[in-house]
Amino acid sequence: DLEQRGLLDETLIIWGGEFGRQPVFQGKNGGRDHNPKGFTYWMAGGGVNAGTDYGETDELGHEAVVNRHHIRDLHATILHLMGLDHEKLFYHYGGLDQRLTGVVPAAPIYPLIS
């Protein structure tokens, strides 16, 4: 166990995916399509503000309506927790500074960081 061994504070644990599922049943064959407008991540350890619930979806669970962020902001947060500055970590290609968070501005989600 990471906490028992004193390693939890320096180990970042992340569970999630880059999209959720539509909150309603679709079509005669069943199933639910991808939903990039509302999804879940679970984070613990390594600098994460423990016990934090952040953001909400609408009443149907279709899309985020409170504390909305693009996935690139989550990537910037993860890089920050790993001790990396996402704005300084880039390579120049095709006339653009290519970052792990993309070419569009991103920022760490500071309420998630302890």
Indicate residue ranges for each PLM-predicted region.
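Ligand-binding pockets and gating/stacking loops
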Residues: 1-114
